[in-house]
Amino acid sequence: MSAVEGDVADASSLNPQTLGFMCGLEIHQQLATGKLHSRQPGELHDVTIDTVPDEWPRVHRRLRIAKGESGKVDVAAKFEAKRNRSFIYIQSPNSGLIELDDQPPDPHDSEALDIALTISGMLDAHPVPLLQTMRKTVVDGSNTSGFQRTTLVATNGVLNTPTGAVGVDVICLEEDSARKLEAQSTANGEIVIWNLDRLGIPLVEIATAPDVQTPDHAKETALALGTLLRDTRRVRRGLGSIRQDLNVSIACGDRVEIKGCQDLSWIPRIIRLEMARQLHFFRLANELREEIKLPLLPDNRDNTDDIIEEEVRQTVRKLLDKEITDVGKAFDNCDSKMITSTIAKGGVMYAVRLPHLAGRLGTKMPDNEGAQLPRLGRELAGAAKLAGVAGIFHSDELPAYGITEEEVTNVRELLAISDTPSCGFALCCAPDWQAELALESVIERGRLAWHRIRQEVRNVVVKKGAPEDGTTTAMRPLPGGARMYPETDIANLPLAEEEWHRIRSNLPPTRKERQKALLETALGEDQIMQLLDKEIDELFLAGISGELAPGMPALPVKGWATIILDST
């Protein structure tokens, strides 16, 4: 078996170096300007689904899969097309025909472009000579057009951190998405309601190289990037104005993109738990392979033999077929209100066999720090939830949830696995089409148990506005190259050398430089920090130097500081 060491139950003890840890960050920062491709104001309205004004128009849309201009269909788009979802867009006062995709976009907002170039200069990046806007396929409904407009601005920068330099691969200028207000489940599929106030607000996206050395260095890198962005004094502040995505892998796993890392203090924990998850499923894959005498996975993904993996894939496809069985009659006298009410409304109870997975699906158990240990059953449930169902029942956690031992026995009989204790099963109670889609997703994910984890996008599990425990759930496959194609409604924009020289010659001072200027006054450290945090140090310096207004004398240092701090 594998020589990869590490205790999955003690994620903090995992050694990044011996596990072949790789990590990079993607930072998305809102800019304090108008919208990127319309001249609408970039403001957010403080509304919920319950407080949206009745006079705001609503538009109902459904997205359909289509090939991009490359002639290919993106893998994430293929997956999303299986979900029977429709979307309602609420038109806020700062959204118009462009946000509704009923009018071609305007050219880039000049101020947003200037900020993106300024950030590129601060990161010592190399600007591209021709700015070409691209369309990035987005099929979750958060963009009315089905794509996000993004423009590559610069490449090959560097961010200095106390632990070491981190390369910056790309800096892009792109549109933010709409804000989700509510998702409603119906018998015919999910209806998602979006607010268009945020759609089109400029974002600068900064993607680092995989130079992050440890989970703690990831937090340090995010903090350094956030500080640099705030040094521009031209970015938005507050909750949701900056988002950090983490790209994480270990040698025996593969690249996973984790979204929803709002709180920097959680970043190391989230990364360590992902390392533990990848290690767990690598070991499980080899355990399953050994049981049916299949070649084991090598410890490093770089040594993977594609021919062997295809042979394993074909073997497992035959082992876990997609035969779905109606087991509703096993629950004719069920005490579970959830099951009986769903069936009474026309729902079904379907099941699939899970050969060799009995006892390996797992039950909810905490690790040494209270986070849920990785388990296959949770991954299967996550796959099913992407089809829109509330979840599944699997054999390792039954009897429970109002399902009795007798009903479990009846299900095993209907599935013809009564004499096969190593065979598990999964149940789904939902409308017919949804139960089928959910269980097909369960089988697809179950087959992956024999393989190295797939590349995918995952989301931090959040409860009451904060991470539940640092664990994640699957969102969608990691997008492929077919996701991106040229935007034909926006002209290419050449970047003149003199414009780049102007940007480089007028970079804003860093926080340390501003602090140094304030230290030359008679202010105490506390007031200096307050002036910097409130971004009013320039106003303060203008006042004490007599440059606040023509003819105005220099103001007293401490008195002027107190006045402006108290009034902001």
Identify the function of each model-found stretch:
Residues 2-506, 525, 547-552:
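Basic, nucleic-acid-interacting segments
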Residues 496-499, 507-547:
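Long, charged low-complexity interaction segments
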Residues 565-568:
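Small-residue-rich helix-loop
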